[in-house]
Structures are given as C-alpha cells and as structure tokens.
C-alpha cells in the first residue's frame, strides 16, 4: 500500500498526482509523531481495517478505512484547480469531520431508537382507559334495636290487638307505663310458666282511666289524653 508523509503543518506538501486513479486517496495522522500520511487505498479495501506504516517514524497504524474515506485525488484536483496544493490544516479539519460525517450518513439511512415505537408506547395506545373511582358514601351500619324499642313495639301491637279502636298515641303511652312498672320483664327474670306478680302501686291523679290487664296497664277508653315519652 503506497503512501507519502507530511512532516509538519508548516512544511510544503507534495501533490498526490502520482497515485493510481483506480485507488482511493485517504489521509491518516500518525498517532506517534503526528505526521499526516497520504495513503493510497484500493477500492476493494475501503471498508476494511488496513495496516499503514508511517514514513517518518516507521510506526505501524491499524486504520479502519470506513471512517477515513475522502474524495478521490482527481476530484480534489478538479475542485482545487490545476495549480492548487493541499493545505495540511484543511486536511486535519477534514480528518476531524470525517467520523461525524459518516455518523450523520448512517443516521439518515437507518432509523434511530427514538423513531422506533417501544412496547410501552404500543401498550399505552391500546390500553383501555379506566373509569374514575366513584366516591361512595360510607355505608350506614344497622344498629340492633334495643330491648326498650323491641318491648314498646311488641307491646303496642299487643294493645292494639286487644283494642283495635285505640289510637297509636294511647297505645304507646300504655306500653311505656308497662315498661316502667314492670322492670323484671325487661331481663326475663320471670319464666314463662310462672304467673306475673302484680305490683300494688297507688294510682296517682290522671291514672284513673288505666286498668290492669294480664299484669300490664291498658287504657280503659279510647279518649284518654296521655302524653307519650
């Protein structure tokens, strides 16, 4: 592989007209003495890794020619004119820009990873939107009716069954009095087979119309004005 070296940026550089037109001219910088080397590479080796020997320090370089491909010498001669010569400073700038230019060409030919939709993007596109959560009011816990409420309810039903013409207000008043005067019934202290012991209590004013019936108070008339609890 033929080559010519350039000793320093300030020295004159020979025109590479003596290279074969069937080969490709590339410029490589020696990593030991920093000399610019003009390398004549055959077209069959443009995309291979070749070994270049520096003509100044005899250092061997392993060069990947894919990143050092530059226009052919005859094309550079036509662009620069018949009496123009290569400037080493321009060659250094071209060498620095060659890898970036190659990367730009590769990026234009092949899509980047950012252009390829990821699996997460496809999953998000086909994902069914979830319904917003509904703020349900807290469920009200059903309270167990107390012994008093159960007794009053059952007592009102019993009084109305014995006297259908009685009003609900009078039945409630009688049921409340039965609850107050017979506390032993509340806790089941008396068995069902034993008779209920009646309590001898003096009747107060306003209770003349109340009569004892089966151990409970019950109104004697339907028009008794008693205020419920």
UniProtKB/Swiss-Prot annotation:
Residues 45-107 are annotated as: Involved in self-interaction. Keywords: Developmental protein, DNA-binding, Metal-binding, Nucleus, Zinc, Zinc-finger. Its cofactor is Zn(2+). One of its GO terms (biological process) is specification of plant organ position. Its main location: nucleus. Expressed in abaxial regions of young lateral aerial organs, and in primordia leading to cotyledons, leaves, flower meristems, sepals, petals, stamen and carpels, but not in roots. Binds 2 Zn(2+) ions per subunit. One of its GO terms (molecular function) is zinc ion binding. Involved in the abaxial cell fate determination during embryogenesis and organogenesis. Regulates the initiation of embryonic shoot apical meristem (SAM) development. Required during flower formation and development, particularly for the patterning of floral organs. Positive regulator of class B (AP3 and PI) activity in whorls 2 and 3. Negative regulator of class B activity in whorl 1 and of SUP activity in whorl 3. Interacts with class A proteins (AP1, AP2 and LUG) to repress class C (AG) activity in whorls 1 and 2. This is Axial regulator YABBY 1. It comes from Arabidopsis thaliana. The gene is YAB1.
């Amino acid at each position: 592989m033929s080559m010519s070296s350039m000793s320093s940026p300030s020295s004159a550089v020979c025109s590479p007209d003596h290279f074969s037109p069937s080969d490709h001219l590339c410029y490589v910088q020696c990593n030991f003495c920093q000399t610019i080397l003009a390398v004549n590479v055959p077209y069959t080796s443009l995309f291979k890794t070749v070994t270049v020997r520096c003509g100044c320090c005899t250092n061997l370089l392993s060069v990947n020619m894919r990143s050092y491909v530059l226009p052919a010498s005859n094309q550079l001669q036509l662009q620069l004119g018949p009496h123009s010569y290569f400037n080493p400073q321009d060659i250094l700038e071209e060498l620095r820009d060659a890898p970036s230019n190659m990367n730009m060409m590769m990026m234009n030919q092949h899509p980047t990873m950012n252009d390829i939709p990821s699996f997460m993007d496809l999953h998000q596109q086909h994902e069914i939107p979830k319904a917003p959560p509904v703020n349900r009011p807290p469920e009200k816990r059903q309270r167990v009716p107390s012994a008093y409420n159960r007794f009053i309810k059952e007592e009102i039903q019993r009084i109305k069954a014995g006297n259908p013409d009685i009003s609900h207000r009078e039945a409630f008043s009688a049921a409340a009095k039965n609850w107050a005067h017979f506390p032993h019934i509340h806790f089941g202290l008396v068995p069902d087979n034993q008779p209920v012991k009646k309590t001898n209590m003096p009747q107060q004013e306003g209770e003349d119309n109340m009569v004892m019936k089966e151990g409970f108070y019950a109104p004697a008339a339907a028009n008794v004005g008693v205020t419920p609890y």
